[in-house]
């Protein structure tokens, strides 16, 4: 019979047993994930981003907003009380790549959709200190003058369709029209206003 002392004295045996434990742990934790519907299917009510929201998401990524804002409310009481219902995997099925983030210089944004008006976001993006005096977020006034980029929107939507986002041909065909005469600020606000709205929240 193997004793603890025997295992510690035999390095080869100890390595084999460590690898065996890691392998079993990996199988138990990882293998079931693809078969769990809650991890792979969208939550009820989740819609793909509209062309305007998708363009706003690109602006969000380009400007590095993920460096200071996360988009994942963790299942802790303090977070739920501050931000709203905790995030679930089915809300991110159409996010390629997801924007969970790992740093919060600013607040989490996953439940910001519908919390403030479009005008509030517009004022905040131009100069955050107009609304939150202690904010260290930079302003983004140029977004109000930059036209929303419609050049490659159809290509983006087709690429997303290849990875499972259910865009229809008609949506792709009408995408440029939705971006006509819209600014990057319009697009970013549209994106922020849809974040976390697929699941109804109890406030």
Segments and roles (model prediction):
Residues 56, 62-71, 121, 188-192:
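The canonical Cys-X-X-Cys-His
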Residues 31-38, 63-67, 72, 76, ...:
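A generic secondary-structure signal for well-formed alpha-helical elements
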Residues 32-46, 51-54, 70, 86-99:
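Sequence context of c-type cytochrome heme-c attachment sites
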Residues 37-61, 73-80, 105, 175-178, ...:
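Electrostatic cytochrome c docking/interface patches
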Residues 14-24, 81-185:
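Electron-transfer interface patches adjacent to heme c in soluble/periplasmic c-type cytochromes
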């Amino acid at each position: 019979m193997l004793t603890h002392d025997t295992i510690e004295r035999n390095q080869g045996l100890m390595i084999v047993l460590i690898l065996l434990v890691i392998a079993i742990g990996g199988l138990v934790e990882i293998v079931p994930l693809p078969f769990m519907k809650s991890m792979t299917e969208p939550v009820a009510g989740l819609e793909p981003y509209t062309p305007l929201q998708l363009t706003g998401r690109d602006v969000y990524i380009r400007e590095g907003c993920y460096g200071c804002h996360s988009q994942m409310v963790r299942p802790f009481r303090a977070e739920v009380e501050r931000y709203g219902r905790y995030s679930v995997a089915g809300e991110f099925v159409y996010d390629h790549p997801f924007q969970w983030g790992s740093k919060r210089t600013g607040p989490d944004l996953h439940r910001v959709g519908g919390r403030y008006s479009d005008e509030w976001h517009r004022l905040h993006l131009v100069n955050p200190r107009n609304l939150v005096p202690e904010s260290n977020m930079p302003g983004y006034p140029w977004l109000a003058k930059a036209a929303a980029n419609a050049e490659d929107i159809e290509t983006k939507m087709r690429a997303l369709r290849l990875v499972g986002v259910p865009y229809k041909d008609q949506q792709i065909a009408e995408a440029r029209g939705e971006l006509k005469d819209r600014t990057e600020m319009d697009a970013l606000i549209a994106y922020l206003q849809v974040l976390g709205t697929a699941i109804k929240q109890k406030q």
